């Protein structure tokens, strides 16, 4: 499943390349068009594709081969490759990791952070035992809602859910802008630190 990880997000064209495998089936979507147009695709080994030559699968035809979406995919992938954005994500992974480590050392509310390429996730905690601010399926604790508001005030929009948030900057970002983004996250985390139970 390369829907979130495909097309450079992890510093390789596809995340499965990090494991040195060649999957039988690959699903992809968002990165195909850089989310400018709706498009999804399934890639598969020839033997699997051959199976469907005489056994047509009639699902997923709503936007089948839509010319606008296909043109957006072609242009997006060309820019991604021509402008070195996959390499940029790989290069900036070290900067993102350094900044995530800084957040963890500067903010007691940061339990852990992980990153591959420019795909990151940060786990927050309300005490040293690692208890989350909100559980799975929770509609959002007041602390996490306040954190999201602070991020927006800082000019950042990201996925904040339960007791986690994502760090997924654009693949064209430069080092200075990436570091500034982390500085803004750090300022927003002050709200979460205020609720930390020491």
What are these regions (language model features)?
Residues 2-198:
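Conserved N-terminal phosphate-binding loop of PLP-dependent enzymes in the Aspartate aminotransferase
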């Amino acid at each position: 499943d390369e829907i979130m990880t495909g097309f450079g997000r992890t510093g390789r064209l596809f995340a499965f390349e990090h494991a040195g495998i060649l999957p039988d089936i690959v699903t992809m979507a968002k990165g195909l068009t850089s989310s400018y147009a709706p498009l999804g695709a399934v890639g598969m080994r020839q033997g699997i594709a051959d199976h469907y030559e005489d056994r047509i699968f009639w699902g997923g035809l709503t936007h089948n081969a839509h010319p606008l979406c296909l043109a957006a995919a072609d242009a997006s992938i060309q820019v991604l490759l021509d402008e070195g954005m996959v390499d940029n994500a790989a290069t900036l992974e070290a900067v993102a990791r350094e900044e995530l480590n800084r957040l963890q050392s500067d903010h007691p509310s940061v339990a852990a952070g992980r990153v591959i390429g420019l795909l990151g996730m940060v786990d927050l905690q309300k005490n040293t035992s690692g208890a989350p601010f909100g559980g799975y399926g929770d509609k959002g604790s007041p602390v996490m809602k306040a954190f999201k508001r602070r991020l927006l005030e800082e000019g950042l929009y990201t996925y904040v859910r339960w007791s986690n948030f994502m760090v997924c900057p654009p693949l064209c970002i430069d080092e200075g802008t990436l570091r500034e983004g982390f500085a803004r996250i750090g300022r927003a985390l002050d709200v979460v630190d205020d609720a930390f139970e020491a």
